[in-house]
Structures are given as structure tokens and as C-alpha cells.
């Protein structure tokens, strides 16, 4: 009974909902919120200021969109979004208003905007955009070794896994790509970063 009440509960706090009039539920937002909070907590642990850090987001479903929104609210500059239909790159960072618009005006779980560039173009360019934070929050097993290496060469500090098993390893959990990433940068694994809904289920 608690679950049937809590998961569809409408978020009415203006500090937590991107748009109260849209009627976002706990289930819509909580996983992305947790992904963002894992990054915020990471920088608190290492006594580094998250404001002004730059982030690349992979995906634009509930997890990716909400994570981007909460990170932007915390002062992170979202410099790129890559999704199945295409993407957006803005090296100076998308405004919080733009991120909010992209989230609340979706008609599907994919990125929709007038200035979207093609997938081929964004996939060619985005891995070389300077960013400290990467949020893989699309499908599983998409993230290639070459893409991680390019991001590492452009100041990557932390990967927070919004998707389950985001690395393109043959192994189920911990293969050579994820091992390399974990040696070079901080990797917040899926079972920590994206457990928001699971945590709600344990309520």
C-alpha cells in the first residue's frame, strides 16, 4: 500500500519539480535525482565545488533528463546531450531554462528540439567536448573504450551510471572497458547512482 501511494505521488515542491503543472511523480524523477545527487555528493566528499563543472548527458529519458535538470540546478553546465535521434552541443553550457524546456516539452523519451544536430554529427564531436562529468543514461552497453579515452583527454573526472551496465563490455558486470574507466577516473556504479527507484521500493 505504501508503494502504490508513494511511487505515483505527485511532486509538488517547486525545488524538486521542473514544472508543478505537469504533474511529475516520484517515479518520474527519483532515479535521475539520485544520479545527480551521487555526483553532488562525490564533489562534496573531495571538497571540490561542483558549480561551473561541465557535464555531457547520454540519453534523454526520465533518468537522463531529470539528472541533467538537477545537475543544472546545482550549477553544473550541461555542455552536450547525445540521444538516439541526435543531440545538442553548447560548450558554454545550456541554460537552466533551456534544460527545463527540453525536459518538460518532451512528447516521448527522446530529445526533441529545433536546433538538434544529427546523431552522426553529435556522435563524432561530443566525445571531444571539455567536460568533467559524464552521465550515461541511455541503453545498456553503449559506451565504447574509444569514447571514454577521448573524454579522459578532455578533463573527465567522474562517470555516474544512470544506465544499468553502460559500458560495452561482453562481461555482465565488470569488463576491460569499465576497469579502464575506473582506473583513470571515478566511476559511480549503477547500483549506487541509479538506485533511486529501488530505494523508493524499500520504503
Where is each model-derived feature located?
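Short glycine/serine/threonine-rich phosphate/pyrophosphate-binding segments
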Residues: 63-67, 142-146, 168-170, 194-197
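Divalent metal-coordination and catalytic microenvironments
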Residues: 35, 134, 190
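Short, well-ordered coil/turn residues at beta-beta hairpins
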Residues: 135-137, 162
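Adenosine-phosphate binding glycine-rich loop
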Residues: 153-203
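Glycine-rich phosphate/diphosphate-binding loop of Rossmann-like nucleotide-binding domains
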Residues: 18-22, 26-130
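Conserved helix-loop functional segments at active or binding sites
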Residues: 40-48, 140, 149, 165
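N-terminal ligand-binding/catalytic initiation module
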Residues: 1-25
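Rossmann-fold NAD(P) dinucleotide-binding segment
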Residues: 123-131, 141-159
Amino acid at each position: 500500500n505504501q508503494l502504490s501511494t508513494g511511487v505515483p505521488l505527485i511532486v509538488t515542491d517547486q525545488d524538486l519539480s521542473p514544472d508543478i503543472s505537469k504533474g511529475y511523480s516520484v517515479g518520474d524523477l527519483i532515479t535521475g535525482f539520485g544520479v545527480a545527487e551521487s555526483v553532488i555528493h562525490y564533489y562534496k566528499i573531495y571538497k571540490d565545488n561542483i558549480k561551473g563543472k561541465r557535464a555531457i548527458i547520454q540519453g534523454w529519458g526520465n533518468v537522463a533528463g531529470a539528472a541533467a535538470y538537477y545537475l543544472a540546478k546545482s550549477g553544473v553546465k550541461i555542455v552536450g546531450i547525445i540521444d538516439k535521434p541526435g543531440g545538442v552541443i553548447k560548450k558554454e553550457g545550456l541554460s537552466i531554462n533551456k534544460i527545463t524546456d527540453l525536459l518538460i516539452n518532451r512528447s516521448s523519451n527522446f530529445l526533441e528540439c529545433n536546433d538538434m544536430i544529427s546523431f552522426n554529427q553529435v556522435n563524432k564531436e561530443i566525445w571531444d567536448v571539455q567536460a568533467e562529468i559524464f552521465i550515461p543514461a541511455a541503453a545498456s552497453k553503449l559506451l565504447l573504450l574509444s569514447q571514454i579515452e577521448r573524454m579522459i583527454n578532455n578533463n573527465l573526472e567522474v562517470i555516474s551510471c544512470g544506465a544499468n551496465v553502460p559500458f560495452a563490455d561482453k562481461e555482465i558486470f565488470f569488463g576491460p572497458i569499465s576497469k579502464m574507466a575506473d582506473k583513470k577516473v571515478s566511476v559511480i556504479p549503477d547500483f549506487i547512482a541509479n538506485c533511486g527507484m529501488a530505494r523508493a521500493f524499500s520504503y
